[in-house]
Amino acid sequence: MATLVDIEQLKRNIREIDSSSVYEETSLAEEESKAFKKILKLASIREQAGKKLHERLIKDGFSEQAVSNALGRAIDAHIVDDERYAEAFMRTQLAQGKGRRGVERALEQLYIDSPSEEAWQLAYEQFG
């Protein structure tokens, strides 16, 4: 009989593991969905840098995996676009009288490449 009890306990343990895995997957999917909605909300207000969004979502309590998945979806859908952010940031900074080096340094801290030379020329014509 001891063997039967052990087998039954093993079956219960397996069921618990299976059900907790399903819960974790569902929970991750729900968390990712909430993180994606937060990205949509923030991106609808103004352009967002991927790194800043990542930091904000982690600070707001989302898991690394949920943030990475949601941010990946937003980037794939062009909701978040670091190149577009860089150009908007550049124009804003130049309009405020800031110089090119300062803008480039700020973008480097966000791991964003500097806008193209053509974008700089257009911005200088408009604000410079």
Model region roles, listed by residue range:
Residues 1-128:
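An alpha-helical, amphipathic repeat domain used for nucleic-acid recognition
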